[in-house]
Amino acid sequence: MRLAVLAGVLAVVAAVVFFRSRVAEHRTYDDVPGRLKELRDNSDPTAFFGFHTRDVDALYFVYENGALFLDYELYNSPKEGYAAPFRKTAAAHGFSVTTTSYDQVHTVLRIQLSSVESEAAEQAYGIAHDLFGINRATKLEFLPQCT
């Protein structure tokens, strides 16, 4: 009996931990530098995190080969219309945009940010603010860090 109760409790705790790790959190942009540090410290080369900018749009932070990147995926035809504004905003902030893909199907627009978390967060904030109207008080839906 005790073993069954213990097993049940452990199963519930494991389920809560699992689902909580997959649920988006609502925070402000001030949490980005800490998240960037966690991302850099993560040993999984496929780890990333992002936040919704509006409805289903999202910006993603990626740490690859010692560099931090800000990515914007053009995953459907309507999103392709945002490529030019993204490039223009990036250029206004002194960045060039490269293209890559996560799945060899959809284009991802990529900006290389500073390797210093606080600077990278500020650089990305400028882009997010100008392109999507985000400000420091905006509650953002952070996408779970994927590993």
PLM regions: where:
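Structured alpha/beta or helical-core interaction and ligand-binding surfaces enriched in interleaved
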Residues: V17-T147
